[in-house]
A protein has these predicted regions:
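Class I S-adenosyl-L-methionine-dependent methyltransferase catalytic core
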Residues: 1-187
């Protein structure tokens, strides 16, 4: 697994040893970031990024590599947080990232954390955790008005967009679906 674009392009990231963590494949990550940059006026530059169900941190690290100002990684798994810390340290990203142990589907209030303009959600497939996490983001004040969110889910999961979000598009790659959303109410 490697960083596919930006200033860290080509740098390796630690991969999980267990099947409990499912990082976004390099090819899919590259496609997703091309969509964000070319179809959504590059929401990455100087963004505050939130990477929920972060696993290895590949999505947030990719955003930092491409110009995001800050990334917060949230995962409650012990192996995931160890991988995250390893990747952050190996890539020299300690000053622009934080790793939180928290349930991404039950975040609570964001205060005193500043809200985020770009959010990645890559929950375990077919567990309906994305919908819960989106409601938690909305209700807890984690999002800037108009924040862009990307949900990665199994195509077969039949993801339903909760209130407070506008569906912008869906892209399917094999058995994976990216759903791009916009926060429509200030949180």
């Amino acid at each position: 697994m490697r960083v596919v674009g930006g200033r860290l392009k080509g740098r390796n990231m630690a991969s999980p040893s267990s099947r409990d963590i499912r990082p976004t494949a390099d090819r899919l990550r590259e496609s997703l970031f091309n969509i964000l940059i070319h179809a959504y006026d590059d929401p990455i530059a100087d963004a505050r990024v939130l990477d929920l169900f972060a696993g290895t941190g590949a999505l947030g690290i990719e955003a930092i590599s491409r110009g995001a100002a800050f990334a917060l990684f949230v995962d409650n798994g012990t192996e995931a947080r160890a991988l995250l810390r390893n990747n952050v340290e190996a890539l020299g990203l300690g000053g622009v990232t934080k790793v939180y142990r928290r349930d991404a589907a039950d975040l609570g209030p964001a205060h005193p954390i500043e809200p985020f303009s770009l959010v990645f959600l890559d929950p375990p497939y077919r567990m309906k955790l994305a919908e819960k996490a989106l409601a938690s983001l909305r209700d807890g004040g984690w999002l800037t008005p108009g924040a862009l969110l990307v949900v990665e889910e199994a195509k077969a999961a039949e993801f339903v967009v909760p209130d407070g979000f506008e569906e912008l598009e869906r892209r399917v790659y094999d058995d994976t679906e990216f759903v791009l959303l916009r926060a429509v109410t200030a949180s």
